[in-house]
Amino acid sequence: MNKVKIFISIILLMILGAAISYADSNMNTKYSTLKSSLECINAEYEFYNVKYNSEIEYNISKEKLKKVLFNIVKIFGVSQNEIVYDENWNNKKKEIFINVELENIKISINGIKKNSNEAYITVDISEHKVYKHIEDDYNELEKLLKNYSSNTEIYACIVGKYTKKLQNDKYDDILDEILYNMSAEEIHKIKNEHFLSAVAYGKVLRYSELNYLGKKINLNIAIRYKEDIGETYVYIASPIIKIDY
């Protein structure tokens, strides 16, 4: 029964996530806030993930779109020879793909002209393992996207770990510490022996709100013990977790 409840809650969060959209967020504040919550529970930093989906002018030219995508990559100090580029530009499809896979970061950027009325840029930055001094990079990316879009969806998640198994009651202590740090109210929680998932509304996160069970949420916290490696992972996301855990 617990597994069924967990599955239903995760599916519900994924459905809700498809509906979120906002134009004026502050990635510096969001990253700093998520990082401070990880620090307050003394978890070891593992990586940071962020996903963007920006609706742009549908009549953007191929060359201009290509230039925007390469400018995004430059923000993170990626050299030309580290970029894998591909495109599918014809009468049926108009798509540009850029992929970067380095030791400390993975970047996937797509520029898509879906039809005569819709065009998008999607940016997926995963496993960003650099911990300090990355706020400026995300601020610059945010500003660049705002030059071309007034409608951007953003999902951010910071991941930490403990290199051991924790007592089950410690999960609640960790959750309480994060909620306190975020000035957050718990809205819903599911817990079993090796897993905890909670959604909440944090006063310090003044954006990216979703409606969940009739209440506003902007914070998703999960704790999972991975028995195969003997480590406990903590996921702190706003507004919801969009990665596998």
Listing of model-derived features with the role each one plays in the protein:
Residues 162-215:
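Intrinsically disordered, low-complexity segments enriched in Gly and acidic/Ser/Thr residues
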Residues 58-65, 134, 168-171:
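Solvent-exposed, acidic/flexible segments
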Residues 70, 74-170:
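Extracytoplasmic beta-rich ectodomain segments of secreted or membrane-anchored proteins
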Residues 56, 127-129, 162-164, 225, ...:
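Beta-strand elements of well-folded, non-transmembrane domains
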Residues 46-56, 116-126, 232-239:
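Short, hydrophobic/proline-enriched secondary-structure or compact coil segments at domain edges
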Residues 9, 16-20, 24-35, 135, ...:
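Soluble, non-membrane globular domain cores that form compact, hydrophobic packing
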Residues 205-245:
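A cross-kingdom marker for long, charged
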Residues 1-105:
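N-terminal leader/presequence regions that precede the main folded/catalytic core
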